[in-house]
Swiss-Prot record:
Keywords tagged on the record: Biomineralization, Extracellular matrix, Phosphoprotein, Repeat, Secreted
Protein name: Amelogenin
Originating species: Monodelphis domestica (Gray short-tailed opossum)
Annotated positions of the Phosphoserine modification: S16
Annotated Pfam families: Amelogenin
Length: 202
Protein backbone atom coordinates (compact mmCIF):
# COMPACT_ATOMS: atom_id res chain seq x y z
CA UNK A 1 0.00 0.00 0.00
CA UNK A 2 1.68 3.25 -1.05
CA UNK A 3 2.03 5.90 1.60
CA UNK A 4 0.01 9.10 1.27
CA UNK A 5 2.06 11.31 -1.05
CA UNK A 6 1.69 14.63 0.74
CA UNK A 7 3.05 15.33 4.25
CA UNK A 8 -0.24 16.96 5.28
CA UNK A 9 -1.94 13.57 5.34
CA UNK A 10 -2.39 12.22 8.91
CA UNK A 11 -0.98 8.85 7.87
CA UNK A 12 2.05 10.30 6.13
CA UNK A 13 5.36 8.87 7.32
CA UNK A 14 8.45 10.80 6.38
CA UNK A 15 11.43 8.45 6.48
CA UNK A 16 13.88 11.19 5.53
CA UNK A 17 13.99 13.04 8.85
CA UNK A 18 17.23 11.55 10.16
CA UNK A 19 18.50 10.07 6.92
CA UNK A 20 18.06 12.54 4.08
CA UNK A 21 17.98 15.91 5.79
CA UNK A 22 21.71 16.56 5.18
CA UNK A 23 21.37 15.16 1.68
CA UNK A 24 18.33 17.29 0.99
CA UNK A 25 20.16 20.35 2.24
CA UNK A 26 23.23 19.59 0.15
CA UNK A 27 21.14 18.76 -2.92
CA UNK A 28 19.15 21.94 -2.49
CA UNK A 29 22.39 23.90 -2.24
CA UNK A 30 23.76 22.25 -5.36
CA UNK A 31 20.43 22.55 -7.15
CA UNK A 32 20.40 26.27 -6.40
CA UNK A 33 23.95 26.72 -7.70
CA UNK A 34 24.01 24.15 -10.51
CA UNK A 35 20.41 23.73 -11.66
CA UNK A 36 21.36 21.90 -14.88
CA UNK A 37 23.40 19.05 -13.40
CA UNK A 38 20.45 16.80 -12.73
CA UNK A 39 19.78 17.83 -9.14
CA UNK A 40 16.27 19.04 -9.91
CA UNK A 41 14.97 15.53 -10.74
CA UNK A 42 16.74 14.22 -7.65
CA UNK A 43 14.86 16.69 -5.46
CA UNK A 44 11.59 16.54 -7.37
CA UNK A 45 9.92 14.53 -4.60
CA UNK A 46 11.76 16.45 -1.89
CA UNK A 47 10.37 19.89 -2.74
CA UNK A 48 7.90 19.77 0.13
CA UNK A 49 10.48 18.77 2.68
CA UNK A 50 13.41 20.91 1.56
CA UNK A 51 11.66 24.25 2.00
CA UNK A 52 11.06 24.10 5.77
CA UNK A 53 14.40 22.45 6.50
CA UNK A 54 16.20 25.33 4.81
CA UNK A 55 13.98 27.98 6.32
CA UNK A 56 14.47 26.58 9.82
CA UNK A 57 18.17 25.76 9.67
CA UNK A 58 18.71 29.04 11.51
CA UNK A 59 18.01 26.90 14.57
CA UNK A 60 20.78 24.36 15.24
CA UNK A 61 18.35 21.50 15.85
CA UNK A 62 17.59 19.46 12.73
CA UNK A 63 15.11 17.08 14.31
CA UNK A 64 12.64 19.76 15.43
CA UNK A 65 12.01 21.44 12.04
CA UNK A 66 10.52 18.28 10.48
CA UNK A 67 8.01 18.02 13.32
CA UNK A 68 6.92 21.59 12.78
CA UNK A 69 6.82 21.58 9.00
CA UNK A 70 4.44 18.64 8.69
CA UNK A 71 1.33 20.83 9.07
CA UNK A 72 3.08 23.68 7.31
CA UNK A 73 3.73 21.58 4.24
CA UNK A 74 0.05 21.39 3.38
CA UNK A 75 0.17 25.16 2.99
CA UNK A 76 3.55 25.17 1.24
CA UNK A 77 2.77 22.46 -1.29
CA UNK A 78 2.12 25.07 -4.00
CA UNK A 79 5.35 26.78 -2.94
CA UNK A 80 7.99 25.57 -5.43
CA UNK A 81 8.24 29.22 -6.60
CA UNK A 82 9.34 30.02 -3.06
CA UNK A 83 12.32 27.70 -3.33
CA UNK A 84 14.62 30.31 -4.86
CA UNK A 85 13.62 32.50 -1.92
CA UNK A 86 13.70 29.90 0.86
CA UNK A 87 17.13 28.33 0.20
CA UNK A 88 18.66 31.81 0.48
CA UNK A 89 18.11 32.20 4.25
CA UNK A 90 19.38 28.66 4.70
CA UNK A 91 22.59 29.52 2.89
CA UNK A 92 23.23 32.84 4.53
CA UNK A 93 23.82 31.68 8.11
CA UNK A 94 26.45 29.40 6.59
CA UNK A 95 27.93 31.71 3.97
CA UNK A 96 28.17 35.08 5.74
CA UNK A 97 30.02 33.57 8.68
CA UNK A 98 32.89 32.63 6.41
CA UNK A 99 32.62 35.33 3.78
CA UNK A 100 32.29 38.21 6.19
CA UNK A 101 35.20 37.11 8.33
CA UNK A 102 37.57 37.64 5.39
CA UNK A 103 35.65 40.82 4.60
CA UNK A 104 35.76 42.20 8.15
CA UNK A 105 39.56 42.50 8.25
CA UNK A 106 39.39 44.35 4.93
CA UNK A 107 37.59 47.39 6.40
CA UNK A 108 40.13 47.18 9.19
CA UNK A 109 42.98 47.18 6.67
CA UNK A 110 41.57 50.01 4.61
CA UNK A 111 41.81 52.57 7.43
CA UNK A 112 45.24 51.22 8.34
CA UNK A 113 46.55 51.98 4.86
CA UNK A 114 45.90 55.73 5.16
CA UNK A 115 47.34 55.74 8.68
CA UNK A 116 51.01 55.53 7.62
CA UNK A 117 50.30 58.26 5.05
CA UNK A 118 48.46 60.38 7.65
CA UNK A 119 50.46 59.70 10.79
CA UNK A 120 49.63 63.11 12.34
CA UNK A 121 45.92 62.22 12.00
CA UNK A 122 45.59 58.65 13.34
CA UNK A 123 42.33 59.44 15.13
CA UNK A 124 40.33 60.23 12.02
CA UNK A 125 40.61 56.73 10.50
CA UNK A 126 39.91 55.27 13.95
CA UNK A 127 36.62 57.14 14.26
CA UNK A 128 35.09 55.49 11.16
CA UNK A 129 36.14 52.15 12.64
CA UNK A 130 34.11 52.73 15.79
CA UNK A 131 30.75 53.13 13.96
CA UNK A 132 31.68 50.09 11.89
CA UNK A 133 32.08 47.87 14.94
CA UNK A 134 28.46 48.18 16.14
CA UNK A 135 27.41 47.68 12.52
CA UNK A 136 29.42 44.46 12.22
CA UNK A 137 26.77 42.32 13.98
CA UNK A 138 24.27 43.78 11.52
CA UNK A 139 26.49 43.12 8.51
CA UNK A 140 25.56 39.41 8.27
CA UNK A 141 21.97 40.60 7.88
CA UNK A 142 22.63 43.35 5.33
CA UNK A 143 25.01 41.52 2.94
CA UNK A 144 22.42 38.76 2.58
CA UNK A 145 21.07 40.65 -0.42
CA UNK A 146 24.43 41.20 -2.15
CA UNK A 147 25.43 37.65 -1.19
CA UNK A 148 22.77 36.24 -3.49
CA UNK A 149 24.87 36.84 -6.64
CA UNK A 150 27.83 35.44 -4.70
CA UNK A 151 26.11 32.12 -4.05
CA UNK A 152 26.80 30.63 -7.50
CA UNK A 153 30.50 31.29 -6.93
CA UNK A 154 32.50 28.07 -7.07
CA UNK A 155 34.62 28.90 -3.97
CA UNK A 156 31.49 28.34 -1.91
CA UNK A 157 31.02 24.82 -3.23
CA UNK A 158 33.74 23.40 -0.93
CA UNK A 159 32.22 25.42 1.92
CA UNK A 160 28.82 23.83 1.41
CA UNK A 161 30.30 20.49 0.45
CA UNK A 162 31.97 20.32 3.85
CA UNK A 163 28.99 21.57 5.85
CA UNK A 164 26.67 18.57 5.20
CA UNK A 165 29.25 16.21 6.74
CA UNK A 166 28.61 17.16 10.41
CA UNK A 167 24.86 16.36 10.25
CA UNK A 168 25.58 12.94 8.69
CA UNK A 169 26.37 10.99 11.91
CA UNK A 170 22.66 10.02 12.11
CA UNK A 171 23.24 8.01 8.92
CA UNK A 172 25.27 5.12 10.43
CA UNK A 173 22.55 4.05 12.93
CA UNK A 174 20.23 3.20 10.03
CA UNK A 175 17.33 0.98 11.02
CA UNK A 176 18.01 -1.63 8.28
CA UNK A 177 21.33 -2.32 10.00
CA UNK A 178 19.73 -3.12 13.36
CA UNK A 179 17.77 -6.20 12.19
CA UNK A 180 21.05 -7.41 10.67
CA UNK A 181 22.90 -7.17 13.99
CA UNK A 182 20.97 -10.10 15.61
CA UNK A 183 21.82 -12.15 12.51
CA UNK A 184 25.53 -11.94 13.30
CA UNK A 185 25.21 -13.63 16.75
CA UNK A 186 23.15 -16.36 15.07
CA UNK A 187 25.93 -16.97 12.59
CA UNK A 188 28.42 -17.01 15.45
CA UNK A 189 26.27 -19.52 17.33
CA UNK A 190 26.61 -22.09 14.53
CA UNK A 191 30.39 -22.37 14.84
CA UNK A 192 29.82 -22.76 18.60
CA UNK A 193 27.69 -25.84 17.99
CA UNK A 194 30.33 -27.06 15.58
CA UNK A 195 32.91 -26.64 18.34
CA UNK A 196 30.83 -28.85 20.64
CA UNK A 197 30.68 -31.46 17.90
CA UNK A 198 34.42 -31.17 17.47
CA UNK A 199 34.82 -31.66 21.20
CA UNK A 200 32.69 -34.78 20.96
CA UNK A 201 34.85 -36.00 18.11
CA UNK A 202 37.97 -35.31 20.14
Amino acid sequence: IPLPPHPGHPGYINFSYEVLTPLKWYQSMMRHEYPSYGYEPMGGWLHHQIIPVLSQQHSPSHSLPPQHHIPIMAAQQPAPPQQPVMPVPGQHPMAPTQHHQPNLPQPGQQPYQPQPAQQPQPHQPIQPIQPIQPIQPMQPMQPMQPMQPMQPMQPQTPVHAVRPLPPQPPLPPMFPMQPMSPMLPDMEAWPATDKTKREEVD
